[in-house]
Amino acid sequence: MLGATVGSLATLGSAMATERAAARSQFVQWRRQHRRDAYANYLGAVYDRDVTLDAVRDALRADRPDLRDVDEKMERFVARARDVHRAAELVILEGPSSVVEALYAVVRAAADLAEVVRRMVRDAHADDTSRKAEDTALAAEREHLLYQAVKGLRTAAADVLGDSGIRH
């Protein structure tokens, strides 16, 4: 009788351990999927914002830019930037800190680029071309730094998710 009781308790303990392991595995998968979705949404929003900023820069390339067109494109850029901020909040919540640090590098690089483009827009409105060549080169340099920061974020996200295939 004692042997049967011990055997039953051992079986019950084993079943409980298996159930806990399954629940933990399910939680880990759920968390991974939420992080993947948050990271993908953020990167998609960053891409959309960058496309609208490229459109602003393209509109500013003309010797005499159409200011109405430039302003409309800037409005679209501002709307996309808001989308990026909303998506960033979820990444910050999902973490971990390595991804959040990489996200902040993207935020800083994007802000640096946007600052140059905003100055270019102000100069276009003032019909001031004295810094146009310098700012165009600076914007290209900052765009490259932003690209590097986004690459760093993708790498950090891949490390967290265990997806080495999305590093490049």
Model-predicted regions and their roles:
Residues 1-4:
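Feature marks short, highly hydrophobic, charge-poor N-terminal signal-anchor/signal peptide-like helices
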Residues 13-168:
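Conserved non-transmembrane functional hotspots
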